[in-house]
């Protein structure tokens, strides 16, 4: 539930390496 400051509209979350995932076109962690 914490925004990672990254969007995932066109590309996947680069921050997925830090445990972030795409939700509603924004990358979140927990």
UniProtKB/Swiss-Prot annotation:
Query: What positions does the cross-link Cyclopeptide (Gly-Asn) connect?
Result: 1-30
Q: Where are the transmembrane segments?
A: none
**One Pfam assignment:** Cyclotide
What SUPFAM superfamilies does its record include?
Cyclotides
The UniProt comment on domains reads:
The presence of a 'disulfide through disulfide knot' structurally defines this protein as a knottin.
Protein family according to the UniProt entry? Belongs to the cyclotide family. Bracelet subfamily.
In its UniProt entry, what is this protein called? Answer: Chassatide C3
Query: Species name for this entry?
Result: Chassalia chartacea
């Amino acid at each position: 539930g914490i925004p990672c400051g990254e969007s995932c509209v066109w590309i996947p979350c680069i921050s997925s390496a830090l445990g972030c995932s795409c939700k509603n076109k924004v990358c979140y962690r927990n």
